[in-house]
């Protein structure tokens, strides 16, 4: 266990991140639906503002030193994958895919990461984790109901976002043996806006009016707060303790969707989400035990 393990602080920071993300999602969705803003415009403005807010933290990392890397091409690919995930997610919200459905499907990201770790990183996954992964996707199918008459392909956008964010996390894992965490953060924050700009230009629409700008600024500030809160959570408490609190984002986003749009999720959401959460919890616990065994051997 970490010397600086403060469970209550870690839990509160993770819950703060979940609440901030719920606000971000509902605000971004409201801006797209009510003001007709393209999701690419929302992504560009939201993350550009977040970077301005988080700039003081960026300076503490030592930008010049953090920029030193021999893996620049891989960092470009890593950030590109993250941006595609962001774009698909905001596209889903703009469509609109209800927040309750989107956030539950987004929770399949660790399942994709498990598949990628076996196929790409050549890690030994084992039968138990393969079964847990398959079970998790069954939960996603229950939420999606692809056999229903009213099924829409747009419902798959959050699944696409989950896939690209899982790919991003695998890139982080691969690069962690070459570069420091500060290098990862600096390149992410510096490259995310140029990528978002390239994707926003073809469909660019200038946000018009005080209300929409207040919404976008609020979303940017909350995005920065969420990222900072996650970093604080993992800094003050053990990862194995903090990780389960990430699942609080589901009820928080469901609550936000109900308050802002009046969306009430059907019963199948809770069944499917419970299956996904249990599958991810099993995989996370397995990974934690594996890491401890490796540290003990070392």
Curated annotation (Swiss-Prot):
It is a multi-pass membrane protein. It is found in: Cell membrane. Residues 10-144, 156-284 form the EamA domain. The chain crosses the membrane at residues 8-28, 35-55, 79-99, 101-121, 125-145, 151-171, 184-204, 211-231, 258-278. Its main location: membrane. Keywords: Cell membrane, Membrane, Repeat, Transmembrane, Transmembrane helix, Transport. Pfam families: EamA. One of its GO terms (cellular component) is plasma membrane. Transports riboflavin into the cell. Belongs to the drug/metabolite transporter (DMT) superfamily. 10 TMS drug/metabolite exporter (DME) (TC 2.A.7.3) family. PANTHER family: ACYL-MALONYL CONDENSING ENZYME-RELATED, SOLUTE CARRIER FAMILY 35 MEMBER G1. This is Riboflavin transporter. The lineage of its organism: Bacteria, Pseudomonadati, Pseudomonadota, Gammaproteobacteria, Vibrionales. The gene is ribN.
